[in-house]
């Protein structure tokens, strides 16, 4: 069981992770160190990794398995859980308690998931349990998935046609935001990715100006270039634009 205030506060979670980092590395965790370890813990839970799979990741992140276990043990001893644990335990309950599962299925007769490319493997697993009668509508674009470091699982969109009985897949191929020049170049670039649905994107905003390729020598130079462009547009565009 959990105490009423079972959810660990972010400041306490941050201190816990920093303490664990200190014990394993013998030095203070920088903000980057904290973010990396915090993201790794989130990734493990959202991707539902086994102990063996965690050890495979450890090739790139020394002591990850031990630090993850230390983190989980500390939460357990304090009768607390983090946000990701809430999904882990929710999935456990749905799998083990048919009464709870059937009750939720009756309550949520239809399910709509927006920005589905950003959802994780454990979230898709929970959704699949709840949407057992093809009563699911998912809106997403695997081409726009940019949160892999946070365990986004766009592969679930590709598996949608296999996980559900006779699903209807609607491709939205008209772009109302960008000009044809931008859409064409973006499609040429993303088509190199083979893990996607084929699309034939078209623009509703005309041809537009040609896309320019700009080379910079560093990330800082990239930021300065973008800042210069922003300042130029601020000076030249009408105030109402």
Question: At which residue positions do the language-model features occur?
Answer:
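P-loop NTPase Walker
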Residues: 1-3, 102, 155, 167, ...
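Conserved P-loop NTPase-based nucleic-acid remodeling module centered on helicase motor cores
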Residues: 1-39, 66, 70, 74, ...
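Conserved phosphate/pyrophosphate-binding and hydrolysis machinery centered on Walker-type P-loop NTPases
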Residues: 7-10, 27-34, 54-61, 80-84, ...
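Conserved helicase NTPase motor core
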Residues: 9, 58-159, 174-178
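Short glycine-/polar-rich loops that comprise or flank the Walker A/P-loop
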Residues: 16, 132-135, 141-143, 163-169, ...
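Residue-level signature of catalytic and energy-coupling elements of molecular machines
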Residues: 17, 41, 82, 114, ...
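Helicase P-loop NTPase motor core
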Residues: 165-168, 174-241
């Amino acid at each position: 069981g959990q105490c009423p205030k079972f959810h660990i506060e972010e400041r306490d979670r941050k201190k816990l992770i920093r303490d664990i980092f200190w014990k394993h590395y013998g030095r203070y965790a920088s903000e980057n160190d904290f973010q990396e370890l915090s993201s790794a813990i989130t990734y493990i839970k959202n991707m539902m990794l086994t102990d063996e799979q965690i050890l495979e990741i450890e090739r790139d992140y020394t002591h990850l398995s031990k630090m993850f276990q230390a983190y989980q043990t500390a939460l357990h001893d304090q009768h607390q859980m983090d946000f990701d644990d809430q999904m882990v335990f929710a999935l456990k309950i749905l799998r083990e308690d048919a009464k709870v599962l059937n009750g939720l299925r009756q309550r949520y007769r239809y399910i709509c998931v927006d920005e589905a490319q950003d959802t994780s493997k454990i979230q898709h697993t929970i959704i699949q349990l709840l949407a057992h009668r093809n009563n699911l509508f998912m809106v997403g674009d695997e081409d726009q998935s940019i949160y892999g470091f946070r365990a986004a699982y766009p592969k679930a969109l590709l598996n949608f046609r296999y996980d559900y009985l006779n699903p209807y897949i609607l491709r939205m191929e008209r772009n109302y935001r960008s000009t044809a020049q931008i859409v064409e170049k973006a499609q040429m670039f993303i088509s190199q990715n083979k893990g996607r649905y084929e699309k034939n994107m078209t623009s509703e905003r005309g041809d537009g100006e040609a896309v320019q390729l700009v080379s910079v020598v560093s990330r800082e130079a990239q930021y300065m270039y973008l800042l210069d462009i922003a300042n130029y547009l601020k000076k030249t565009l009408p105030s109402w634009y």
